Amino acid sequence: MNYQQARDFLDQLQFFKIKLGLDSMTRFLNRLGNPQQHLHCIHIGGTNGKGSVGATLCSILSAADYKAGFYTSPHLSSVRERFRIGNTYISKEDFARLMSKIEQVLDGNQITYFECTTTLALLWFAEQEVDCVLLEVGMGGRLDATNVITPLVSIITNVSMDHELYLGATLAQVAGEKAGIIKKQIPLVSAVADDDSGEVIRQTCEERNAPLFLFGQAFRGRVGEDASRWQYQGLDGQLLNDLPMAMKGNYQIGNASLALATVQLLNRQGWSINEEHIRTGLAQTRWPGRLEYFRRKQEGREDCPEGLRFLIDGAHNPAGVAALQQALKDFSFRQLILVWGAMVDKDLGTTLQTIAPMAGTIIFTRPESERSASPEQLQAALPPTLEPKIILTGSVQAALEQACALAAADDLICIAGSLFLVGAARQLLLGDLVNE
């Protein structure tokens, strides 16, 4: 099996619907020698911020000379983005070889796309003998394919409404699914709110005798005197001042604080990560497609010698879009040009009505996904009074061309609503993250 054949094999698994449950995953891993049993893992769940926490931890662990594996989803443009060690993505050769092994062991049995990528990640990390795996939950937690490990530390970033069809119609129900990654006597780090979801998390920790370390109580983070720096108060009360923050958005302080609390718990278990490692790791953290700001020069635009300004963000649920709206207040611009695409199963009205009033122009488009909402469906989610500033386009390419044609040097083009859209737009604007 070569790389293209491996991709084709994986892609055809998308036709199997999302399947929540661990029985088939457990049996399959057993046939592969249970690679997960040879790994030291940190399990990262929650509604928003999982990737940011994982990217921060990966950077800090790498700065401390640990071999850190990071498994995340979804990807922006290449499936190989889901698997990396430090800053190195899985090679085409390793991807194809391990996919071939999976196909042989499957022997015609059914597996989902996410079960397959999770299995490949566990195999690769075990084979590469990584020191630590940062394993991001795909959806929920209790029945997620990643929930086959016993981690060193569990993390639940936060809980808000998302994937209601699978996880439940109330915060408490969603929290119950995410609490499924809490293991007996394994510490949990969380920034869950003091609401129904927080009560579920606290109660589950008590039932499983899992030590709970809450942001705002056991540890804290806040903006420093210089807005580009921040302060962390740790589990032992120690203050770390004037910390760097490579990622944009004040909400990233909460995500970084979760990472630092996790680092402290690792140190309590015998790891060796010092303040210098933390500062270096924080300064070098990169997480593409999440409040990612850049300029791009346009041919024939002498009025924009430094290029047009872009901000791309994967916000796709009410809480994520609210965070994006808040972050936009830190940018100066004459006009906000919003390029938006979303999945039809999302809360289109709530998300759009949060951010649409900030925009001078709204360009709706449709990412390439069978779950994508049509531009007309997106327009219908907004009140008729906003129609004069709405433009409908049939492709991401057309949406970007329209946005660039309308934008002036002091405007900001914000692309958001779906990671499918962000991935496609980023690829068109900046090229591939991973060379395909």
Language-model regions: role of each:
Residues 1-16:
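Charged, amphipathic alpha-helical linker segments immediately N-terminal to NTP-binding catalytic cores
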Residues 16, 22, 26-39, 63-149, ...:
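ATP-dependent carboxylate-amine ligase catalytic core
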Residues 38, 132-137, 144-155, 159-163, ...:
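Nucleotide phosphate-binding/pyrophosphate-handling subdomain across enzymes
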Residues 44, 52-69:
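A conserved segment at the C-terminal end of the G1
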Residues 71, 187-192, 338-340, 360-368:
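Short internal beta-strands
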Residues 117-166, 198-242:
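Extended acidic/charged loop-beta regions that coordinate divalent cations
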Residues 123-126, 261-268, 427:
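Short glycine/serine- and small hydrophobic-enriched flexible loop segments
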Residues 194-213, 224-226, 305-312, 318, ...:
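C-terminal helical cap/extension that packs against the catalytic core
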